[in-house]
Protein backbone atom coordinates (compact mmCIF):
# COMPACT_ATOMS: atom_id res chain seq x y z
CA UNK A 1 0.00 0.00 0.00
CA UNK A 2 2.83 2.44 0.77
CA UNK A 3 4.42 2.04 -2.67
CA UNK A 4 1.04 2.41 -4.40
CA UNK A 5 0.29 5.48 -2.27
CA UNK A 6 3.56 7.15 -3.21
CA UNK A 7 3.17 6.20 -6.86
CA UNK A 8 -0.38 7.50 -7.19
CA UNK A 9 0.55 10.64 -5.25
CA UNK A 10 3.14 11.59 -7.86
CA UNK A 11 0.91 10.40 -10.71
CA UNK A 12 -2.10 12.46 -9.67
CA UNK A 13 0.08 15.39 -8.62
CA UNK A 14 1.75 15.50 -12.02
CA UNK A 15 -1.58 15.10 -13.79
CA UNK A 16 -3.09 17.95 -11.79
CA UNK A 17 -0.06 20.09 -12.62
CA UNK A 18 -0.53 19.47 -16.34
CA UNK A 19 -4.29 20.03 -16.24
CA UNK A 20 -3.82 23.31 -14.37
CA UNK A 21 -1.49 24.64 -17.05
CA UNK A 22 1.64 24.25 -14.89
CA UNK A 23 0.23 26.77 -12.43
CA UNK A 24 2.14 25.28 -9.55
CA UNK A 25 5.46 25.33 -11.41
CA UNK A 26 5.58 28.52 -13.46
CA UNK A 27 3.33 30.80 -11.45
CA UNK A 28 2.14 31.29 -7.91
CA UNK A 29 -1.34 32.64 -8.53
CA UNK A 30 -2.91 29.29 -9.39
CA UNK A 31 -6.37 28.98 -10.89
CA UNK A 32 -8.66 31.76 -9.67
CA UNK A 33 -11.82 33.49 -10.67
CA UNK A 34 -14.09 31.42 -8.44
CA UNK A 35 -17.51 32.77 -7.42
CA UNK A 36 -17.56 34.96 -4.34
CA UNK A 37 -20.01 32.62 -2.62
CA UNK A 38 -17.48 29.80 -2.96
CA UNK A 39 -14.45 31.75 -1.78
CA UNK A 40 -16.39 33.16 1.18
CA UNK A 41 -17.62 29.74 2.28
CA UNK A 42 -14.44 28.69 4.13
CA UNK A 43 -13.96 32.16 5.60
CA UNK A 44 -17.32 32.52 7.34
CA UNK A 45 -18.24 31.51 10.87
CA UNK A 46 -21.32 29.84 12.32
CA UNK A 47 -22.06 30.75 15.94
CA UNK A 48 -18.53 32.09 16.17
CA UNK A 49 -16.98 28.83 14.93
CA UNK A 50 -15.01 28.97 11.65
CA UNK A 51 -16.45 26.80 8.91
CA UNK A 52 -13.27 24.68 8.46
CA UNK A 53 -13.34 23.86 12.18
CA UNK A 54 -16.99 22.80 11.89
CA UNK A 55 -16.10 20.41 9.06
CA UNK A 56 -13.18 19.14 11.13
CA UNK A 57 -15.40 18.39 14.13
CA UNK A 58 -18.08 16.74 11.99
CA UNK A 59 -15.49 14.52 10.28
CA UNK A 60 -13.96 13.60 13.64
CA UNK A 61 -17.36 12.60 15.02
CA UNK A 62 -18.21 10.61 11.89
CA UNK A 63 -14.95 8.67 11.83
CA UNK A 64 -15.01 8.13 15.60
CA UNK A 65 -18.44 6.53 15.34
CA UNK A 66 -17.33 4.54 12.31
CA UNK A 67 -14.09 3.23 13.79
CA UNK A 68 -15.16 2.64 17.40
CA UNK A 69 -18.87 1.87 17.20
CA UNK A 70 -19.39 -0.20 14.04
CA UNK A 71 -18.37 -3.57 12.63
CA UNK A 72 -16.58 -1.71 9.85
CA UNK A 73 -14.18 -0.10 12.32
CA UNK A 74 -13.59 -3.38 14.11
CA UNK A 75 -12.78 -5.03 10.79
CA UNK A 76 -10.30 -2.27 9.95
CA UNK A 77 -8.41 -2.77 13.23
CA UNK A 78 -8.42 -6.56 12.82
CA UNK A 79 -7.08 -6.27 9.27
CA UNK A 80 -4.38 -3.93 10.56
CA UNK A 81 -3.31 -6.53 13.12
CA UNK A 82 -3.23 -9.39 10.63
CA UNK A 83 -4.88 -9.40 7.22
CA UNK A 84 -4.49 -13.16 6.87
CA UNK A 85 -6.13 -13.90 10.22
CA UNK A 86 -8.92 -11.47 9.35
CA UNK A 87 -9.46 -13.27 6.05
CA UNK A 88 -9.66 -16.62 7.83
CA UNK A 89 -12.23 -15.02 10.16
CA UNK A 90 -14.54 -14.39 7.18
CA UNK A 91 -13.86 -10.64 7.17
CA UNK A 92 -14.10 -9.12 3.66
CA UNK A 93 -10.54 -7.81 3.58
CA UNK A 94 -10.45 -6.42 0.05
CA UNK A 95 -13.86 -4.78 0.27
CA UNK A 96 -12.96 -3.20 3.61
CA UNK A 97 -9.68 -1.85 2.27
CA UNK A 98 -11.33 -0.43 -0.84
CA UNK A 99 -13.92 1.26 1.36
CA UNK A 100 -11.20 2.77 3.55
CA UNK A 101 -9.32 4.06 0.51
CA UNK A 102 -12.51 5.54 -0.92
CA UNK A 103 -13.37 7.31 2.34
CA UNK A 104 -9.80 8.61 2.59
CA UNK A 105 -10.12 10.02 -0.92
CA UNK A 106 -13.43 11.69 -0.04
CA UNK A 107 -11.92 13.23 3.09
CA UNK A 108 -8.97 14.53 1.04
CA UNK A 109 -11.38 15.99 -1.50
CA UNK A 110 -13.31 17.82 1.24
CA UNK A 111 -10.04 19.22 2.61
CA UNK A 112 -8.99 20.31 -0.90
CA UNK A 113 -12.28 22.12 -1.51
CA UNK A 114 -11.96 23.94 1.81
CA UNK A 115 -8.37 24.93 1.03
CA UNK A 116 -9.29 26.28 -2.40
CA UNK A 117 -12.22 28.18 -0.90
CA UNK A 118 -10.03 29.58 1.89
CA UNK A 119 -7.19 30.76 -0.34
CA UNK A 120 -9.39 31.68 -3.30
CA UNK A 121 -7.21 29.86 -5.82
CA UNK A 122 -6.38 26.29 -6.81
CA UNK A 123 -2.87 24.92 -7.21
CA UNK A 124 -1.74 21.37 -7.77
CA UNK A 125 0.70 21.62 -4.84
CA UNK A 126 -1.60 23.52 -2.49
CA UNK A 127 -1.71 20.86 0.24
CA UNK A 128 1.80 19.46 -0.17
CA UNK A 129 3.02 21.20 2.98
CA UNK A 130 0.41 19.40 5.09
CA UNK A 131 1.65 15.88 4.33
CA UNK A 132 4.32 15.59 7.02
CA UNK A 133 2.30 17.39 9.76
CA UNK A 134 -0.65 15.07 9.03
CA UNK A 135 1.49 11.95 9.41
CA UNK A 136 3.04 13.39 12.57
CA UNK A 137 -0.39 14.12 14.05
CA UNK A 138 -1.68 10.61 13.35
CA UNK A 139 1.36 8.92 14.90
CA UNK A 140 1.45 11.37 17.80
CA UNK A 141 -2.25 10.72 18.39
CA UNK A 142 -1.68 7.05 19.11
CA UNK A 143 -1.90 5.29 15.76
CA UNK A 144 0.38 2.31 15.35
CA UNK A 145 2.49 2.68 12.20
CA UNK A 146 2.34 -1.10 11.80
CA UNK A 147 -1.47 -1.11 11.95
CA UNK A 148 -4.01 -2.61 14.28
CA UNK A 149 -4.61 0.26 16.70
CA UNK A 150 -5.34 3.95 16.71
CA UNK A 151 -7.51 6.69 18.12
CA UNK A 152 -9.60 9.18 16.18
CA UNK A 153 -9.84 11.63 19.06
CA UNK A 154 -6.15 11.24 19.83
CA UNK A 155 -5.28 12.03 16.22
CA UNK A 156 -7.67 15.00 16.24
CA UNK A 157 -6.10 16.47 19.38
CA UNK A 158 -2.62 15.84 17.99
CA UNK A 159 -3.60 17.57 14.74
CA UNK A 160 -4.71 20.63 16.70
CA UNK A 161 -1.47 20.53 18.70
CA UNK A 162 0.69 20.31 15.58
CA UNK A 163 -1.35 23.04 13.91
CA UNK A 164 -0.97 25.39 16.87
CA UNK A 165 2.73 24.59 17.02
CA UNK A 166 3.27 25.46 13.36
CA UNK A 167 1.14 28.59 13.67
CA UNK A 168 3.18 29.69 16.67
CA UNK A 169 6.43 29.10 14.80
CA UNK A 170 5.17 31.16 11.86
CA UNK A 171 4.11 33.98 14.17
CA UNK A 172 7.56 33.88 15.73
CA UNK A 173 9.12 34.38 12.31
CA UNK A 174 10.57 30.88 12.00
CA UNK A 175 11.14 29.93 8.32
CA UNK A 176 8.99 27.18 6.82
CA UNK A 177 12.04 25.02 6.22
CA UNK A 178 12.86 24.97 9.93
CA UNK A 179 9.21 24.34 10.79
CA UNK A 180 9.14 21.35 8.44
CA UNK A 181 12.39 20.07 9.93
CA UNK A 182 10.91 20.31 13.42
CA UNK A 183 7.83 18.38 12.28
CA UNK A 184 10.06 15.65 10.88
CA UNK A 185 12.12 15.56 14.07
CA UNK A 186 8.96 15.31 16.15
CA UNK A 187 7.77 12.40 14.00
CA UNK A 188 11.08 10.58 14.47
CA UNK A 189 10.97 11.11 18.24
CA UNK A 190 7.40 9.81 18.44
CA UNK A 191 8.17 6.73 16.32
CA UNK A 192 11.29 5.93 18.35
CA UNK A 193 9.40 6.43 21.60
CA UNK A 194 6.59 4.16 20.42
CA UNK A 195 9.06 1.47 19.35
CA UNK A 196 10.85 1.65 22.69
CA UNK A 197 7.52 1.38 24.52
CA UNK A 198 6.46 -1.66 22.48
CA UNK A 199 9.78 -3.45 22.92
CA UNK A 200 10.66 -2.27 26.41
CA UNK A 201 10.80 -5.82 27.79
CA UNK A 202 13.30 -6.93 25.16
CA UNK A 203 15.35 -3.77 25.77
CA UNK A 204 15.38 -4.36 29.53
CA UNK A 205 16.44 -7.97 29.02
CA UNK A 206 19.23 -6.85 26.69
CA UNK A 207 20.51 -4.31 29.23
CA UNK A 208 20.33 -6.83 32.08
CA UNK A 209 22.70 -9.23 30.35
Map each language-model feature to its residues.
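Transmembrane helix-bundle core of multi-pass membrane transporters
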Residues: 1-70, 96-99, 119-127, 203-209
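Residues that define the loop-to-transmembrane-helix transition and helix capping
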Residues: 1-3, 50, 68-74, 84, ...
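Hydrophobic core segments of alpha-helical transmembrane domains in multi-pass membrane transport
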Residues: 9-16, 55-64, 101-112, 140-141, ...
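Transmembrane alpha-helices
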Residues: 55-59, 87, 92-116, 128, ...
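Membrane-helix/interface signature in polytopic inner-membrane proteins
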Residues: 61-101
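Cytosolic-side transmembrane-helix boundaries in multi-pass membrane proteins
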Residues: 88-95, 169-209
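Transmembrane alpha-helical segments in multi-pass inner-membrane proteins
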Residues: 101, 108, 118-184
Amino acid sequence: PLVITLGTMYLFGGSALLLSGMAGATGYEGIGGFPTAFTDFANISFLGIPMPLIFFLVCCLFFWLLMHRTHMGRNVFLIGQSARVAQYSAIPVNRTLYTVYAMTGCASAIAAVLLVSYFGSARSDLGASFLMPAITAVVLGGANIYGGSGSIMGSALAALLVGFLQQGLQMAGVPNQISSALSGALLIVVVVGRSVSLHRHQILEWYSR
